[in-house]
Amino acid sequence: MFPFSYPADDRWLLPEGIEELLPEEAERLELLRRRVLDRFAAWGYRLVMPPLIEFIDSLLTGAGHDLDIQTFKLIDQASGRLLGIRADMTPQVARIDARTHAGDTPGRFCYLGSVLHTQADRLEKSRSPIQFGAELYGHSGRASDLEIIRLMLEVLTTAGVERIHLDLGHVGIFRGLARQAGLTGEQEGELFSLLQQKARPELTAAVASLDIDPPLARMFTELVDLNGRHGVMERARECLSEANAAVHMALEELAVLAERLGDCCPEVPVNFDLAELRGYRYQTGVVFAAFVPGYGREIARGGRYDDIGKVFGRARPATGFSADLKVVLRLSGLGESFVGSGEAIFAPAVSDPALIAAIRELRDAGRIVIEALPGQQGDAAAHGFRSELRRNGERWCVCPVASKDT
């Protein structure tokens, strides 16, 4: 028995950041879910359903500190071991690929399900996203990065999201400079944090305190300003001309990827942001994010993380993206195309085998039929229906509902 109880007026409250969906929004979300999964299937991505809860050592293996602090933890009453409620499905899919996908052929997986966070997103204020995404394992070339980005853009467009623009970055640029400078893990972490904040004065001071060559110090600080569209790659090649081969290889990968995106998705503006390092601790190459005007953060993001399966005994090249279905729904145009009760057909409370057969035939054809209950007050018009079943001789036919004003 609980040592306390809530006042009766508070029992309907949900925990902070936990939402429920009422019928209209839930039905729109389900419509979007089907569209997303159908689009994944059309590209050959096979649906997997990882468990909501796992042993913590499996759930967080190779995932990093950020995911650890976002994960709810509890004790398994059956085994006594520590469990975690998933906060991100990406490591789970990596485990599935490592354990079940035989051979070296590419593995294409998609997923969609609820995740839970200990801390709310600063913009959405939610701790219960519905995460969906796609992962491509077993190919390390630019073609797989391009495929995943194209898939992400197509899924968002299919969902009704408009005016998408894309940001591209590459963690190999910062990582290459850090290796060239011989930074310790602590020093690298400090510069990483300042770059994410785009805090140029603090970054300049931090770099000045390190014992590194002036050209390297300059390259670190100039990363903050290497963002935008036209001319960014030319400026980057000039600013980073004294960087090592790994940095130049990363720049070339970005340039080629942007060129190919321009060929296949010319309607999508592409921006570069060489200080963009989200997921730096486990991502290994290209990183990308989709944005729309008027929304203060990305609506989908992803990148390459070739080492994520190593801890499961099989390190395969990997790239993928993820997004929150609830965020995409809010930014999509599905509200206008939603099929609500106005499109349903009203059936009277009449015991007639012919009526039952007519209702079954309509439902088999994909129509919505709502049957009145005995004693129910109000006719079809009173309940807002535009169509109803009426007897016409021996048959029941769908007829328009006369307006209450006529």
Curated annotation (Swiss-Prot):
Broad class of the protein's primary localization: cytoplasm
Pfam families assigned: tRNA-synt_His (PF13393)
Annotated GO MF terms: histidine-tRNA ligase activity
Compartments it resides in: Cytoplasm
Gene Ontology CC terms, in alphabetical order: cytoplasm
Sorted UniProt keywords: Amino-acid biosynthesis, Cytoplasm, Histidine biosynthesis
Matching InterPro entries: aa-tRNA-synth_II/BPL/LPL, HisRS-like_core, HisRS/HisZ, HisZ
GO biological process, one term: histidyl-tRNA aminoacylation
Pathway annotation from the record: Amino-acid biosynthesis; L-histidine biosynthesis; L-histidine from 5-phospho-alpha-D-ribose 1-diphosphate: step 1/9
Xref: HAMAP family: HisZ
Cited function: Required for the first step of histidine biosynthesis. May allow the feedback regulation of ATP phosphoribosyltransferase activity by histidine.
Sequence similarity: Belongs to the class-II aminoacyl-tRNA synthetase family. HisZ subfamily.
Assembly, per entry: Heteromultimer composed of HisG and HisZ subunits.
PANTHER family according to UniProt: HISTIDINE--TRNA LIGASE, MITOCHONDRIAL-RELATED, HISTIDYL-TRNA SYNTHETASE
Other observations noted: This function is generally fulfilled by the C-terminal part of HisG, which is missing in some bacteria such as this one.
Listed name of the protein: ATP phosphoribosyltransferase regulatory subunit
Source species: Methylococcus capsulatus (strain ATCC 33009 / NCIMB 11132 / Bath)
Name of encoding gene: hisZ
